[in-house]
């Protein structure tokens, strides 16, 4: 029983196992239960706001390789610049940030924050140094613009290009889109050496070491979601490059060369924690019906470099509960004692009550392991018709941070853990609060059957089906009204002492069985019975006299 995480939801916590190369909360103990990773699940759920999806499919953000560059002190006299560069999986722009001028120059959706530097960030000679600092680029990148919505990102998108300032039209970058080293971002596996050569100066566009922070701006405007990049970057190892830019003369012209060599690859892993999970498979989003389907998908809590981008990733979370109309084969009782007394009275006094439909509130709480989620998901996909069916923390950080930075990082991780725990406890408390407010049938434990009568005219099955799918449109108001009615019915039952009705029935039944009551009844009717007997005897005597008289008259007439 899951619901998709949408672009209107607050960012969720995504934990990585390496605090040196990827910013954000870290946890190298995930997954909590490796044996349950990859459990099969079939889903068919609805949505109201666009869901968050990653992969090569309509409605999902596409993956791509992105580069981050820092400049380090030059040691060679022939080198103009010396670089360290990191390449990793990121989010693919729909159009280049320099190609869409309407979005580029629009400041309507520009976030508040530090502007990205105009110069390439400086670093140390250590190749394992990459200091992340969030900043806002001068132009925006469009990640998606279709019927599923418009999603943008204001993070810098670094790339090498030719500086054609003062050059002729023969410069390769005289067009709107500068010449980008496409081979550099083609693969993270095949190429370990890159050489860029040109008679024109190589420069780095969109400076800054900042992570993508996509957000939706149409049809609604939602918060930024920086956690998506931490999922994407862990789907493949990151590659570390080191190199320099040299200047020489060819044909009496300056000739620029950039040599980059890969010296290190770093595997990563990113994880989410309950109640959030990752559905991986052939996910299909249907905007016309606002539904998401996926057959033979798998449930994960972690993504690593073995991920296959032929699949898609859908972020989901466990649902706290739902309302389902069901039929019961016996009357609703609040406790087993009432049930026993009712059965006794039914046998002794031949009294019965009839309940046709009730509403069942499935209080599932938070799904703590993926196994529970898989079973609940399959159950939701199959049928919902009856009561029986429903039934190392800072690894290698000293090489990058000083002692104070390390302490800050540990505190930040603990705060993120605390925040995630508080969110989990808050959802759990809300579930328990709702459960305590309900008056439930005694014969169920994992869910609650309320005494509210199901009104098919107010909540027809199509509304129930959309509620089960998780579509939060106008049905939300109807469900809220239904909850109020159920809580009112529960309060009405709580105003009575438990078992009062049954005990009153027992008292009435025992009163009817009291012999004294029977004697009083006989005394009160004895006189009437005697009078009736006398009347009957008188009538009988009269009939007899009449019969005898008739016989005498007949004998006289027939005499001699």
From Swiss-Prot:
Entry keyword Metal-binding: no
Q: Which residues cross the membrane?
A: 522-542
Q: Where is this region: Fusion peptide?
A: 355-375
Expressed in which tissues:
Expressed at higher level in the thymus. Expressed at lower level in peripheral blood lymphocytes.
Annotated positions for site Cleavage: 354-355
What does the UniProt record tell us about how this protein is modified after translation? Answer: Specific enzymatic cleavages in vivo yield the mature SU and TM proteins.
Disulfide bond sites: none
* Top-rank lineage group of the source organism: Eukaryota
Record GO terms (molecular function): structural molecule activity
> Keywords in UniProt for this one?
Cell membrane, Cleavage on pair of basic residues, Disulfide bond, ERV, Membrane, Transmembrane, Transmembrane helix, Transposable element, Viral envelope protein, Virion
Beyond the main fields, what else does the record say?
A: Orthologs in P.troglodytes and G.gorilla.
According to its UniProt entry, the function of this protein is described as: Retroviral envelope proteins mediate receptor recognition and membrane fusion during early infection. Endogenous envelope proteins may have kept, lost or modified their original function during evolution. This envelope protein has superantigenic properties.
Name of the protein in question: Endogenous retrovirus group K member 18 Env polyprotein
Which species is this record about? Homo sapiens
> Corresponding gene?
ERVK-18
